[in-house]
């Protein structure tokens, strides 16, 4: 599981260090690689362990092949994905299309989201978390958990 928020830099080639805690979680689970893809709700990159990606792909591939709206979502979901390995220094190379999608500049933030990880441009992340969540939404959320 992935938890916590970590500030890092991303270089001009698109390399950024995956936080040590996240690398340790991947290693403990026997996950040698991650899959990077567009996060559909905000301009961020979502990182998933290979096993989580495999589960999602199976569900997506079981989606109705005759429903155009579903297939459009499948296309966006699958086509944005990139399997990546960590280098010897624990860095991940974020592909240019994903860097552009998320607006990743020099400073980035890795956010553990339980089974997945999000990668944000630092300014975008700060804007996102600064938005106040209405208390009724918080109550609804925890009432469903």
From Swiss-Prot:
Q: Which Gene3D superfamilies match?
A: Transcriptional regulator MraZ domain
Question: Can you name this protein?
Answer: Transcriptional regulator MraZ
Family statement: Belongs to the MraZ family.
Give me the gene this protein comes from: mraZ
Spell out the subcellular localization from the entry.
Answer: Cytoplasm, Nucleoid
Q: Which GO terms describe its molecular function?
A: DNA-binding transcription factor activity; transcription cis-regulatory region binding
> According to the entry, what is the taxonomic lineage of the organism?
Bacteria, Pseudomonadati, Myxococcota, Myxococcia, Myxococcales
Q: Which residues form the SpoVT-AbrB domain?
A: 5-50, 81-124
Cellular component GO terms, alphabetical: cytoplasm; nucleoid
GO BP term, pick one:
negative regulation of DNA-templated transcription initiation
Record's subunit section: Forms oligomers.
Record's InterPro entries?
MraZ, MraZ_C, MraZ_dom, MraZ_N, MraZ_sf, SpoVT-AbrB_dom, SpoVT-AbrB_sf
